[in-house]
Amino acid sequence: MKPLLIFDLNGIFLVRQRGATSHKPDFTIGAFKCYVRPGVRRFLKWAHHHFDVAVWSSTMPHNTIPIVKYIWGKKMKDLKFIFSQRHCTQTGTMPCGKPIFLKELKYVWEMFPWYDETNTFLIDDSPHKVVNNPPHTSIHPEPLTFETRHVPIDLKNHLSHLQPL
């Protein structure tokens, strides 16, 4: 069995920008202009070859699904699951009024018992979202921002050592 990689979306594969910008987005969802990081599709082809792949975003479902459809296209069917905000645990609210969410892997392991803390890795740019998970079950790359949106994805080095022998 392949290890499971669970990817966040915003900050990993794309950046969402609200409001006016002179830069043409790759696609738009509601008020958000979305910019996909270069090399994402090539990286995902590699990831799907070596790992089981899933998505867990803290965005609302009506935003999560269109983003996944855009990034994965017809390969969306190869995802083991797609979790959204409704699968997160809300723990409070930021001063700006935005909710604070956790991504608790115990829910993944309850639904998919063949995965556990030895073969599951959550890739998320927000370390605070995984504080209730066992150690060594998450990787936190530098977040993609509007200013760095042209920087190609570079996660293979982080993930190559996780591949089964």
Give short role names for the model-derived ranges.
Residues 65-165:
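C-terminal cap/substrate-recognition subdomain and adjoining C-terminal extension
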Residues 1-96:
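Alpha-helical substrate-recognition element adjacent to the catalytic core
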